[in-house]
Amino acid sequence: MIDWKNIKLDLIKFLKDEVEKTGLKKVTMGLSGGLDSAVVAILCKEAFGDNLNCVLMPSQFSSQSSTDHAIEVCEKFNIKYEIISIEPMVSGFIKNMDEDRLRIGNFSARMRMSVLYDVSSREKSIVVGTSNKSEILLGYGTIFGDIACAINPIGQIYKSDEFEFARLLGVPESILNKAPSAD
């Protein structure tokens, strides 16, 4: 049986230690409304309090329920957030190409990374990632996109194990029960 309470404490300490090494005090992360980003947001809130900035970055390909779930996490845990639509960037890109979902998805991930690093610069903060171990081992991510970050606290947790951890952290049932997506 996995000792999630100690893992939680270890990850919070890891986050604090790694950010302290940079000389910064704030963190920025993307919040999609999915399980991984909800888990990381809760860990970061416990580690950094109000020095956490979550960014929601919808596009025309994002589901409204994902944005709603991200806001639900922010409201439940009193996390400040901002919504920055990547729609203008994505629309400008896809108007001159075919509707290749993989290319659009990868482009969208890279636009989100650019937005996160810009917000991170503005806030004088460090970007925290949300990729779990299963995604990393399977190569399920976009190079220079959603896998780009300075630190990744859940990079050693398999997705199959993450649900139990998420319950301990208090991730809303609406997120625990929804099907995974690449939103």
Description of each model-found segment:
Residues 1-139, 166:
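ATP-dependent adenylation/nucleotidyltransferase module used to activate substrates
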